[in-house]
Amino acid sequence: MTSELSDSSPPGVLFKVHPSVQDFLLSPPAYKTRHFAQGQSHHDNPNFLATGAIVFDRPLHSVRTSALKTPPRILLVQRAPHDSMPLLWETPGGGCDDDDPTILHSCARELKEEAGLDAISVGPLVRCPAASAETATEESRGKGEFELAEAIGCHSFFTRRGKLVFKFYFILEVKQPANVLVDPNEHVAYLWATEDEVRHKRIESEGGKEGVELNFTTEEQRSVLLEAFKQWNNYIVE
């Protein structure tokens, strides 16, 4: 994993862009046309694109400049009780809008809307482990959409209405201090979780605070968080 960022942002982009995600500097419709045009592939094409914002509690570039006295933590938000998948935990994120300038803007916009944080850099991509194919229904196996998602590193899933979604996860650095402000219409709480806490799906009680069970929206959500920690740890030892 590299921390290098482009020296200058493309026109109209207010955040730094990691070199590995230049391909996502396309509007959602343009990205779908380039990669999933009808007749270009035998795979089922996604109906919608979505993004997830993975935010650590410290800038990546600070890892090598100071001793890590505490393990890194990732931001999680808890879904509102009146929404689908009530009270489950996830990263900030959501669907790409067709009028978003680029997919990276979609991710930064969702982070701002759901957590009140301003992105200052976007990328790298966190490739989703091959979990979608494992959890696919028997009716969906072999049709190609899960194999395609695995190949391009995203999480694929079907909505309750049967629409196929491809979701990309990016590591984002944010303007400091990171004062999280959730939208109560979508989320009711937030917390910062370590790798061990994500792995064991629990934050133990400490200092009089009750422990928290980390019940995630999907197993893929948890898997991609562990992959993000893996990228972080690989960067430390490079």
Locate predicted features.
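Intrinsically disordered, low-complexity domain-flanking/linker segments in eukaryotic proteins
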Residues: 59-71, 124-148, 197, 207-210
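A generic fold-level signal
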Residues: 16, 43-48, 69, 83-84, ...
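Active-site segment of metal-dependent pyrophosphate-handling enzymes
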Residues: 116-178
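Nudix hydrolase/Nudix homology domain
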Residues: 2-6, 162-163, 167-238
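Acidic, metal-coordinating catalytic segment for phosphate/diphosphate chemistry
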Residues: 2-66
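Conserved Nudix-box catalytic region and its N-terminal flanking loop in Nudix hydrolases
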Residues: 65-114, 126-132
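Residue-level signal for short segments within beta-strands and strand-turn junctions
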Residues: 55-57, 78, 173-174
